[in-house]
């Protein structure tokens, strides 16, 4: 079953279905850039709002999504990790707001590892709690190009075929019991409670799997079970991952697949962001693992 048929079968609201289909269509455009810029993997000489050097493909993917959405007028608000402000689309046909990490893991491209795109959809402006999100999706560009999405009616995975259509691969994904851990940050910088939690996971036989691509690592957790973490750490106690562009969309997908999301204390999706660049400590994965880190944090 192709994506269009699936959205129709699920009874997805017409305008939302149109937007999801449109966004999925940008996967091919993003992947085209992999070939056209494959010999230029250095920095562009510009930085995003977080002070990170932008790579040519960061800017290329950002341009693909922004220009396509502006031309389509399917959304009113666009916020991306590469921009320092929310873009308001003139003459928008809908009130949707989208948050986008155009190319997660772009530093891995020069060694030909998986990268991805992360997108969250709101009914209106994007400076809202993550629980207000009405849909979330990611596209994983690896040996296969995969689309995983939720509209709060299960989590579903599609694979892109030769024609460009996305075809159903897995319906109603649920996180299984598993023992994979994907921990970000340097061990020497861990805060006490996080370090204790990591030791517990290691003692219980959790295997370390961390690629440097948030999308790829969470995708593996969805299929094999376990937990992804990028904590607050020495020098960055507030965390590193972006609440709007990364944490909220991926948190929605994981929670809809039967998992949980937390900043170590509570579900970060209940936080109203004060700025588009807000960051958060992040733990997502199985409910058991998330309950354990929250317990470690409470105990200090």
From Swiss-Prot:
One of its GO terms (biological process) is sucrose biosynthetic process. It is found in: Cytoplasm. Its EC number is 3.1.3.11. SUPFAM superfamilies: Carbohydrate phosphatase (SSF56655). Keywords: Carbohydrate metabolism, Cytoplasm, Hydrolase, Magnesium, Metal-binding. Binds 2 magnesium ions per subunit. Pathway: Carbohydrate biosynthesis; gluconeogenesis. One of its GO terms (molecular function) is fructose 1,6-bisphosphate 1-phosphatase activity. Mg(2+) 2 binds at residues 101, 104, 246. Its cofactor is Mg(2+). InterPro entries: FBPase_C_dom, FBPase_class-1, FBPase_N, FBPtase, Fructose_bisphosphatase_AS. It is an enzyme of class 3 (hydrolase). The keyword Membrane does not apply. It catalyses: beta-D-fructose 1,6-bisphosphate + H2O = beta-D-fructose 6-phosphate + phosphate. Pfam families: FBPase, FBPase_C. Mg(2+) 1 binds at residues 81, 101, 103. GO terms for cellular component: cytosol. Substrate binds at residues 104-107, 240. Belongs to the FBPase class 1 family. Homotetramer. HAMAP family: FBPase_class1 (MF_01855). This is Fructose-1,6-bisphosphatase class 1. It comes from Methanoregula boonei (strain DSM 21154 / JCM 14090 / 6A8). The gene is fbp.
């Amino acid at each position: 079953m192709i994506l269009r048929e699936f959205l129709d079968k699920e009874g997805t609201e017409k305008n939302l279905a149109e937007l999801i289909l449109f966004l999925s269509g940008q996967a091919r455009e993003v992947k085209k850039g992999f070939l056209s810029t494959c010999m230029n993997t250095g920095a562009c000489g510009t930085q995003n709002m977080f002070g990170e050097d932008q790579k040519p493909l960061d800017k290329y993917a950002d341009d693909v999504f922004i220009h396509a959405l502006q031309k389509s007028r399917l959304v009113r608000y666009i916020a991306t990790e590469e921009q320092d402000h929310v873009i308001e689309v003139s003459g928008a046909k809908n009130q949707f707001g989208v948050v986008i990490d155009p190319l997660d893991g772009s530093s891995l491209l020069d060694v030909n590892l998986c990268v991805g795109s992360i997108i969250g959809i709101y009914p209106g402006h994007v400076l809202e709690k993550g629980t207000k999100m009405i849909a979330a999706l990611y596209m994983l560009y690896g040996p296969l190009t995969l689309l995983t999405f939720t509209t709060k009616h299960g989590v579903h995975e599609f694979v892109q075929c030769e024609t460009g259509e996305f075809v159903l691969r897995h319906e109603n994904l649920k996180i299984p019991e598993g023992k994979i851990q994907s921990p970000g940050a340097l061990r020497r910088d861990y805060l006490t409670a996080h370090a204790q939690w990591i030791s517990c996971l290691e003692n219980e036989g959790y295997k370390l799997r961390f690629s440097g691509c948030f999308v790829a690592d969470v995708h593996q957790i969805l299929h094999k079970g376990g937990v992804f973490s990028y904590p607050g750490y020495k020098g960055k106690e507030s965390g590193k991952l972006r609440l709007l562009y990364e944490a909220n969309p991926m948190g929605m997908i994981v929670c809809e697949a039967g998992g949980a999301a937390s900043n170590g204390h509570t579900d970060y999706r209940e936080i109203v962001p004060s700025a588009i660049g807000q960051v958060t400590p992040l733990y997502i994965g199985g409910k058991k693992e998330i309950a354990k880190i929250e317990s470690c944090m409470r105990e200090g």
